[in-house]
Design a protein with these regions (language model features):
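Generic preference for hydrophobic
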Residues: 15-17, 29, 187, 243, ...
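N- or domain-start disorder-to-order transition segments that initiate the globular core
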Residues: 1-25
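His/Glu-based metal-binding/catalytic segments typifying zinc-dependent metallopeptidases
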Residues: 19-21, 28-30, 214-271
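Charge-rich, well-structured scaffold segments of protease-associated domains
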Residues: 3, 8, 64-214, 220, ...
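Short, solvent-exposed loop/turn segments at the edges of secondary structure
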Residues: 22-24, 82, 182, 236-240, ...
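M16/MPP (pitrilysin/insulinase) zinc-metallopeptidase core fold and M16-derived inactive scaffolds
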Residues: 21, 28-90, 268-284
């Protein structure tokens, strides 16, 4: 069984460590502060604070932050999601202490200097424009805004240029004081470094970094908007289509049956039902993929494909046919066994992607207090029955629950 080490510091910071024989250490902070934690009038604030976190601390200027790991061949980066912001580093194990010190400093001691705000806001505005110019990416955000209309989960992570240009140092500090506290974060380490050394280092660094009381994250109850269909004229060369609907939260027992369904429907394998139907047999699309998007309290699924505009109706009919196949006809024992074997193999291989596994380690521990135990996941997958798969398909893939977004 895979070894994991966990601890909690007196200030509430949770730590998780997985040993590795690799000379590279992946580590970082997963802070429970994302788009859904923004108040009204704070749209885009979580992502704005992420950008400004690299602009200076009480003891480091921006250039010192950028050079700290780079000059020893390391990497420092961050990203913002709907429910978290993750600051992560990759470094040779002999430089682990340097990475831990830097990450702790920028997460808990950033000053968000006003002199850099105007410049960085324009960088984010360019990011917004670039994103809007990529319909195959932007469509996913608009689809989620349809699923969670009028709720924080439905907001765009990047915010709007108009709102961003109003933000000040005081706004960033207020958001950070509320959310960037040890008891609202988890520190993760994946690599060849002694666990007790990490705990000692963080115990030494963090008391001075703690500067307030974090807000207890109590996200409002989430509800799904009614099923809808929206067609948007984007003037693109091909149509971009998303079809999906409500699914399960990240802790729901039925999620494993849905994971099997999703993988069979449009997972990464070239033998997925949609790839065989839309690409291999009909030649209508270059790629078609099915996704599960889960949060601790909600979740949804969708299928994306791009095709010629005159093929949209035909592709949708083929998609609906495949959904109905899962609803109307139970999997045979051989089909279910093959699906489980393929999925378990993919799960196992995914752990070999070290940085991705490290990020998943941090995010899962931050939100669920659990580690991504491969043996436990495989056991849960193998326990799923054909009857359970069919019942989940009937609930999740029901035609009257589908929301559709089309860019033409």
């Amino acid at each position: 069984m895979t070894q994991y080490n966990t601890a909690m510091l007196p200030n509430g910071l949770r730590i998780i460590h997985r040993p590795s024989a690799s000379p590279v250490v992946y580590c970082g902070y997963a802070v429970n502060a994302g788009t859904r934690d923004e108040l009204s009038g704070e749209e885009g604030m979580a992502h704005f604070v992420e950008h400004m976190t690299f602009k200076g601390t009480e003891k480091r200027k921006a250039l010192q932050i950028l050079n700290c790991l780079e000059r020893v061949g390391g990497d420092l980066n961050a990203f913002t999601g709907k429910e978290d912001t993750v600051y992560h580093a990759a470094i040779l194990h002999e430089h682990t202490a340097r990475a831990v010190d830097l990450l702790t400093d920028i997460v808990f001691n950033s000053t968000y200097p006003q002199a850099d705000i105007d410049k960085e806001v324009e960088v984010i505005c360019d990011e917004i424009d670039s994103y809007k110019d990529s319909p195959a990416e932007f469509i996913f955000d608009e689809f989620e805004s349809m699923m969670y209309a009028g709720q924080p989960l439905g907001r765009d992570i990047l915010g709007s240029a108009e709102r961003l240009r109003q933000y000040t140092t005081a706004d960033a500090c207020r958001f950070a004081r509320a959310h960037y506290q040890p008891d609202n974060a988890a520190f993760y380490v994946y690599g060849d470094v002694p666990f007790n050394q990490i705990v000692r280092t963080l115990n030494k660094l963090l008391p001075a970094a703690t500067c307030g009381e974090s807000v207890q994250n109590s996200a409002p109850t989430v509800s799904f908007a009614p099923p809808a269909e929206r067609v948007v004229d984007k003037g693109t060369h091909q149509a971009h289509v998303l079809v999906g609907g409500p699914a399960y939260a990240g802790t729901a027992p039925r999620r494993f049956a849905l994971i099997i369904l999703n993988n069979m429907l449009g997972g990464p394998g070239m033998n997925s039902r949609l790839n065989l139907a839309l690409r291999e047999k009909a030649g209508l699309v270059y790629s078609v993929d099915s996704y599960l998007n889960t949060y601790p309290d909600t979740g949804f699924w969708n299928v994306y494909f791009g095709c010629d505009t005159h093929d949209v109706k035909r592709c949708r009919r083929l998609l609906e046919r495949e959904l109905c196949r899962f609803i109307d006809k139970p999997l045979t024992a051989a089909q279910l066994a093959a699906a489980k074997k393929q999925l378990c193999g993919q799960v196992g291989i995914s752990t070999d992607a070290s940085e991705g596994h490290a990020l998943a380690l941090g995010k899962t521990f931050a939100h669920y207090g659990l580690h991504r135990d491969i043996e436990r996941i495989v056991s849960a997958i193998n326990a799923v029955t054909a009857d359970e798969v069919q019942r989940v398909a009937a609930e999740v893939y029901a035609p009257d629950r589908l929301t559709t977004l089309i860019y033409l």
